[in-house]
Amino acid sequence: MIGRISGLLLEKFPPLVLVDVQGVGYEIDVPMSTFYNLPAVGTQITLHTHFVVREDAHLLFGFATEGERQAFRQLVKISGVGARTALALLSGLSVADLHQTVSNQDPARLIRIPGIGKKTAERLLLELRDKLDLGVSAIPGAAGARRPSTMGSDVLNALLSLGYNDREANWAVSQLSVDLSVSDGIRQALKFLSKEK
């Protein structure tokens, strides 16, 4: 129904962004891989979208690439994997990394992602085994490419494992410079969080 949104980026608060299109503000949930690569507020952006209609809500999910959206659509088709779980997977792994994880049948890599238990990881690997494309073909040079925001995902996972909630962890990661190492990113994020308390 809504396949793409182009407009002015008004607000960024992980994992939500607010995009103004002709005076209408759309709240869009995005994976952290997309969030980390967004331009500054006040800039024109285009997101590939997936629209979900539920009894209690209409939800819009946005992705920087068509490959991310295709992977999201494959993930939500799996029994027990909802939109939020699919978003968490794409926040913790790039599409290329997810493809590699499925190819290698590596459940340990999936279990590190918040909200993914052993049974869900095994079901994901089983059901995705025959659907290995996962949108990777839509990403130029994606065969083994790591997205630049892997550091952010690693820091996010570290903060969540230390007991910070999603909101705190995502906020702290959004404050980081993208050129930090993972260990420096964790140190800096912990400093941000200690100042907020």
UniProtKB/Swiss-Prot annotation:
Disulfide bonds: none
UniProt-annotated stretches for the region Domain I: 1-64
One Gene Ontology term, aspect cellular component: Holliday junction resolvase complex
Residue numbers spanned by region Domain II: 65-142
GO molecular function: ATP binding; four-way junction DNA binding; four-way junction helicase activity
InterPro entries reported for this sequence: DNA_helicase_Holl-junc_RuvA_I (IPR013849), Hlx-hairpin-Hlx_DNA-bd_motif (IPR003583), NA-bd_OB-fold (IPR012340), RuvA (IPR000085), RuvA_2-like (IPR010994), RuvA_C (IPR011114), RuvA_C_sf (IPR036267)
GO annotation terms (biological process): DNA recombination; DNA repair
Region named Flexible linker: 143-153
Region (Domain III): 153-197
Compartmental location: Cytoplasm
UniProt entry keywords in alphabetical sequence: Cytoplasm, DNA damage, DNA recombination, DNA repair, DNA-binding
Record text on subunit structure and interactions: Homotetramer. Forms an RuvA(8)-RuvB(12)-Holliday junction (HJ) complex. HJ DNA is sandwiched between 2 RuvA tetramers; dsDNA enters through RuvA and exits via RuvB. An RuvB hexamer assembles on each DNA strand where it exits the tetramer. Each RuvB hexamer is contacted by two RuvA subunits (via domain III) on 2 adjacent RuvB subunits; this complex drives branch migration. In the full resolvosome a probable DNA-RuvA(4)-RuvB(12)-RuvC(2) complex forms which resolves the HJ.
Function: The RuvA-RuvB-RuvC complex processes Holliday junction (HJ) DNA during genetic recombination and DNA repair, while the RuvA-RuvB complex plays an important role in the rescue of blocked DNA replication forks via replication fork reversal (RFR). RuvA specifically binds to HJ cruciform DNA, conferring on it an open structure. The RuvB hexamer acts as an ATP-dependent pump, pulling dsDNA into and through the RuvAB complex. HJ branch migration allows RuvC to scan DNA until it finds its consensus sequence, where it cleaves and resolves the cruciform DNA.
Record remark on domains: Has three domains with a flexible linker between the domains II and III and assumes an 'L' shape. Domain III is highly mobile and contacts RuvB.
Entry similarity comment: Belongs to the RuvA family.
Protein name: Holliday junction branch migration complex subunit RuvA
Gene name of the record: ruvA
